[in-house]
A protein has these predicted regions:
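Core Rossmann-like FAD-binding/catalytic domain of the broad FAD-dependent monooxygenase superfamily
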Residues: 1-175
Length: 175
């Protein structure tokens, strides 16, 4: 299901138009709309909201790996605040770990990025099961509400997705 339009009059309910999985168009009316529709928010556009670009943009890499050998970590999330290489690291379960690193110019290998967490003579099995990149941009909407439509999560503000913080910020917005 994909929302294709959000419209509201001065008073009364909000009209939401959506397309179902078969391509059929439908409408429904709601007392309020919570626009949790991300960085490219249709709801933000519907209320006339625009981004303020805070001119901050960084590329990050996420690496999920399975390993049988020892990894230097503690039970929790490590947030590394090194200006040369900020990052986030956590144990997901007994054998799976996640690293997130800000990328610099010149692509480092996965082994170079995670070397600080592995002993020099690391002998365990190590398999990258997921590797992806994203670009974090700092942007803030000039409004979070228009009539009976409200913005939550990445629709009004972009948040780095460290360990689910993108989702968690949307829940905090709702509270």
């Amino acid at each position: 299901v994909e929302v294709t339009a959000v419209r509201q009059e001065t008073a009364g309910p909000v009209r939401v138009t959506y397309r179902d999985e078969d391509g059929g168009e439908h409408e429904l009316w709601a007392d309020a709309v919570l626009g949790c529709d991300g960085a490219n928010s249709l709801t933000r556009e519907a209320i006339g909201g625009v981004w303020e670009d805070l001119r901050f943009e960084e590329r990050w890499k996420v690496i999920d790996a399975e390993t049988t050998g020892p990894v230097r970590c503690w039970e929790g999330v490590d947030q590394v605040c090194d200006p040369a290489r900020p990052g986030t690291f956590m144990r997901v379960n007994e054998t799976r770990y996640r690293w997130e690193f800000r990328l610099r110019d010149g692509q480092e290998t996965v082994r170079e990025l995670i070397a600080p967490w592995l002993p020099p003579s690391y002998a365990g099995d190590f398999e990258v099961v997921r590797e992806t990149q994203y670009t974090f941009r700092a942007r803030l909407a000039d409004r979070w509400r228009g009539g009976r439509a409200f913005l939550l999560g990445d629709a009004p503000h972009l948040t780095p997705p460290f360990v689910g913080q993108g989702l968690c910020s949307g829940l905090r917005d709702a509270y």
